[in-house]
Amino acid sequence: MSVTGLPFDDFRVLLRDLPGPDSQALVAARDRDRQLTKPPGSLGRLEEIAMWLAAWSGRAPAVNRPLVAIFAGNHGVARHGITPFPSSVTQQMVENFAAGGAAINQICVAHDLGLKIFDLALDYPTGDITVEPALSERDCAATMAFGMEAIAGGTDLLCLGEMGIGNTTIAAAINLALYGGSAEDWVGPGTGSQGEMLERKIAVVKQAVEFHRDHLSDPLEVMRRLGGREIAAMAGAILAARMERIPVLIDGYVATAAAALLKAANPSALDHCLIGHVSAEPGHLKAIDKLGKTPLLALGMRLGEGTGAALAAGIVKAAAASHTGMATFEQAGVTNAGTH
């Protein structure tokens, strides 16, 4: 326990001492990969993914209990008319998820993925970030802790997504605070903002970052001031997964912004994470580049709700299955290039 006892203190301690990869599991996976019936490197990124799974799960690559976790939150900044949809759509989409009617439901069925939906005080939008912090430190820390519970039921691959009207505005503000540049660099159409609405969105992001500019050197302060409940919850889930050695797939622009806050706090904080896809939101590729990551997919999607991460989970499952299920040269009676 720290001397101050402030709500963020426990998270600061966790972020300072993150567990690393399992070197023995990685060595074992590399040894097996060299024996499989294929030329070295011929499966490309599938081989890299298998090694990543081994290193961060501490065992032979396997995906037996994949889970998509979607966090939903509402934002006070939406009152500025920055999106074509009202905030009530967040609750309506949560109900659609529960009824099995959304795109993510179909992708989860297709790839045999579990799905959990977490609605985060939807009747109580966060503060309007142009004039006040989104959350108090206590509320932000509590929401991070709630997000950590995403893994409570057990999973060996966590896919993170979100739902929240106005949250691409939030993501743009976070990226501007972390990386600089102009608001125009980070603001895109989101759910369809165009023309004057897009100009309002840009102005709101500028105003928010300017209002909080004296408090943006600390990533956790950026989170509570410019973020939202789904941002805090996803950050908590990523952190919990790291502590429990669970590999993570991050979805789109908003989920990437949540992840970026952790990397800003500790450069190694996302080593157990891959980016599922690059979305069509203009700032997403720039944000991914800032993290030093390469997305698994580029399908022109910009839906959110974990869809890109869920699709990428199919690739990760295939990587694990290839590594564990393929025969070795000896088992198959196939001559290895290095043995004749």
Swiss-Prot record:
Pathway: Nucleoside biosynthesis; alpha-ribazole biosynthesis; alpha-ribazole from 5,6-dimethylbenzimidazole: step 1/2. Its EC number is 2.4.2.21. One of its GO terms (molecular function) is nicotinate-nucleotide-dimethylbenzimidazole phosphoribosyltransferase activity. It comes from the Bacteria. The active site is at residue 305. It catalyses: 5,6-dimethylbenzimidazole + nicotinate beta-D-ribonucleotide = alpha-ribazole 5'-phosphate + nicotinate + H(+). GO terms for biological process: cobalamin biosynthetic process. Keywords: Cobalamin biosynthesis, Glycosyltransferase, Transferase. Catalyzes the synthesis of alpha-ribazole-5'-phosphate from nicotinate mononucleotide (NAMN) and 5,6-dimethylbenzimidazole (DMB). Belongs to the CobT family. HAMAP family: CobT (MF_00230). This is Nicotinate-nucleotide--dimethylbenzimidazole phosphoribosyltransferase. It comes from Allorhizobium ampelinum (strain ATCC BAA-846 / DSM 112012 / S4).
